[in-house]
């Protein structure tokens, strides 16, 4: 379990990351109290994840999700990023808008997938929404990050 001093009901059972409601509340509190500059919401999705489960089995899919979740818990614990797992393969991070760190996150998740299979049909898609208006609804920020992630689906080059 993560080192979150939180109620178990606020954590997604498989991953141990914040559920949607708690993630949205934590980000809202953070924005209201800290007024950070240069931060973003990141949406992470695994392209064709349902097909991954069909081909390799749900145990392999769960293992992949657990690997990603452990990495994101580490980001929470070491870097104080806010991390969440909304459903299936939908993960979110509130973090500084740092292209180098985003590429590193992509590389780590790509490595986890590559360990399990050798087909480029299952690639991480990462969408970034730069927080420029703190008053915007956090759910809308997450939706915008998901839209950005969906815009790279099917592309081979830049997937962030």
Segments the model singles out, each with a brief description of its role:
Residues 41, 91, 124-128:
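A structural signal for short, well-ordered beta-strand segments
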Residues 80-86, 120:
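A short pre-motif secondary-structure segment
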Residues 21, 136-139:
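Conserved catalytic/ATP-binding subdomain
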Residues 93-97, 130-133:
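Short beta-strand-to-loop capping motifs
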Residues 105-112:
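Short amphipathic alpha-helices in soluble, non-transmembrane regions
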Residues 6-40, 47-73, 84-88, 92, ...:
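Conserved long alpha-helical elements within nucleotide-processing catalytic cores of c-di-GMP signaling
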Residues 1, 45-48:
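Conserved acidic
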Residues 117-123, 140-160:
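Catalytic/regulatory signature loops of cyclic-dinucleotide turnover enzymes
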């Amino acid at each position: 379990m993560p080192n979150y001093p939180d109620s178990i009901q606020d954590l997604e059972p498989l991953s141990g990351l914040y559920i949607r409601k708690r993630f949205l509340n934590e980000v809202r509190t953070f924005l209201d109290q800290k007024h950070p500059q240069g931060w973003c919401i990141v949406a992470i999705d695994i392209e064709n994840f349902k097909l991954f489960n069909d081909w390799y089995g749900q145990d392999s899919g769960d293992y992949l999700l657990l690997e990603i979740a452990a990495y994101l818990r580490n980001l929470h614990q070491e870097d104080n990023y806010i991390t969440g797992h909304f459903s299936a393969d939908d993960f979110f991070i509130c973090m500084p808008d740092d292209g180098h760190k985003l590429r590193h996150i992509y590389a780590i998740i790509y490595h986890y997938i590559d360990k399990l299979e050798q087909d480029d049909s299952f690639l991480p898609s990462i969408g970034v929404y730069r927080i420029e208006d703190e008053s915007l609804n956090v759910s809308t920020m997450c939706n915008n990050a998901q839209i950005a992630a969906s815009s790279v689906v099917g592309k081979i080059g830049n997937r962030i």
